[in-house]
Amino acid sequence: MIERYSREEMSNIWTDQNRYEAWLEVEILACEAWSELGHIPKADVQKIRQNAKVNVERAQEIEQETRHDVVAFTRQVSETLGEERKWVHYGLTSTDVVDTALSFVIKQANDIIEKDLERFIDVLAEKAKNYKYTLMMGRTHGVHAEPTTFGVKMALWYTEMQRNLQRFKQVREEIEVGKMSGAVGTFANIPPEIESYVCKHLGIGTAPVSTQTLQRDRHAYYIATLALIATSLEKFAVEIRNLQKTETREVEEAFAKGQKGSSAMPHKRNPIGSENITGISRVIRGYITTAYENVPLWHERDISHSSAERIMLPDVTIALDYALNRFTNIVDRLTVFEDNMRNNIDKTFGLIFSQRVLLALINKGMVREEAYDKVQPKAMISWETKTPFRELIEQDESITSVLTKEELDECFDPKHHLNQVDTIFERAGLA
């Protein structure tokens, strides 16, 4: 991922240095496991643990000759050791190291992403509570529907991100597993105890059955889950973009002193952060196809997935980490124009209370079809002539003979839409 959309904490996880360090840890743990089984002298393992070092430049230099990165790596590490070097990579195949270490690196990335998710969820919870009773216009098909509250909107985002967090925790169990089962997965030259020891000490699980590789349905599920999280962010970002339109202006991204919105138009204050999140989400989603096409490998292995994953996994995790952090800050610093929200409710001349009038008539004994046919024409006239809807309702004796002034007051009271907000918040776990 390009530096512009990267945070150092996450980018450092995907460096060659960290990858080789992960490989080395797998190799050393394998030696320790062999030692526990009495196959490698403990003194040799201690020397390997103490003296084995990674030198990325030297490993890459050797790779120019070997054309095999793991062979180059093991030879480079062996250069830092004495006679004990013969135990490095003992009984292992390359993918025992690569796939297990990759899962360990992904675990490191996942630790960061999980913290990102929790921080964002905390911000959403705070916003939901702060604006719990802040009335605003609810819109369906882009058209005014009925009042809701900005807090309910934030509660919706909160519960969606809670689901994303649960899905993420589930996929961690799928993706954070290792395999050290040999060339075709039969443990022909390495006992299962080695795999169990290594994975336990790395803090990851073990695949119950594998070939030379971990099966890539795990990685496809992982990428799809990250893409779904990114898509939720995009959904929220698009909402902010729409609510920041000049004609609506119910929220606005923070605009710093000295910030510029346009090279040509000095007045511009654009939702560029949310637009940025939208674009990043598209990039992340684009990798779903790659992840799924990596699943059908040939027989017990091929490496067609390898080149794709070297690009995909860093890009997706780095981009999502960046997006989560940036969008958390956007929401945290969001300006909310409560007066504009209330004013927008009044823009449609009271039409948004049409269902309240309809239900009131039904409750007084009128047949639904008759009530609907009385209310709808008034709504159409109000929309076309900009006449207050209530005024038209009050001019119809067939309605006023059924509904009293007090009952109409209740129909046109926007606070009615707050009646169940407490219940919604309780159900969302925000009480």
UniProtKB/Swiss-Prot annotation:
One of its GO terms (molecular function) is (S)-2-(5-amino-1-(5-phospho-D-ribosyl)imidazole-4-carboxamido) succinate lyase (fumarate-forming) activity. It catalyses: N(6)-(1,2-dicarboxyethyl)-AMP = fumarate + AMP; (2S)-2-[5-amino-1-(5-phospho-beta-D-ribosyl)imidazole-4-carboxamido]succinate = 5-amino-1-(5-phospho-beta-D-ribosyl)imidazole-4-carboxamide + fumarate. One of its GO terms (cellular component) is cytosol. Its EC number is 4.3.2.2. Disulfide bonds: none annotated. SUPFAM superfamilies: L-aspartase-like (SSF48557). Pathway: Purine metabolism; AMP biosynthesis via de novo pathway; AMP from IMP: step 2/2; Purine metabolism; IMP biosynthesis via de novo pathway; 5-amino-1-(5-phospho-D-ribosyl)imidazole-4-carboxamide from 5-amino-1-(5-phospho-D-ribosyl)imidazole-4-carboxylate: step 2/2. Gene3D superfamilies: Fumarase/aspartase (C-terminal domain), Fumarase/aspartase (Central domain), Fumarase/aspartase (N-terminal domain). Keywords: Lyase, Purine biosynthesis. InterPro entries: AdenyloSucc_lyase_C, Fumarase/histidase_N, Fumarate_lyase_CS, Fumarate_lyase_fam, Fumarate_lyase_N, L-Aspartase-like, Pur_lyase. The active site is at H141, S262. N(6)-(1,2-dicarboxyethyl)-AMP binds at residues 4-5, 67-69, 93-94, 212, 263, 268-270, 276, 307-311. Belongs to the lyase 1 family. Adenylosuccinate lyase subfamily. Catalyzes two reactions in de novo purine nucleotide biosynthesis. Catalyzes the breakdown of 5-aminoimidazole- (N-succinylocarboxamide) ribotide (SAICAR or 2-[5-amino-1-(5-phospho-beta-D-ribosyl)imidazole-4-carboxamido]succinate) to 5-aminoimidazole-4-carboxamide ribotide (AICAR or 5-amino-1-(5-phospho-beta-D-ribosyl)imidazole-4-carboxamide) and fumarate, and of adenylosuccinate (ADS or N(6)-(1,2-dicarboxyethyl)-AMP) to adenosine monophosphate (AMP) and fumarate. Homodimer and homotetramer. Residues from neighboring subunits contribute catalytic and substrate-binding residues to each active site. This is Adenylosuccinate lyase. The lineage of its organism: Bacteria, Bacillati, Bacillota, Bacilli, Bacillales. The gene is purB.
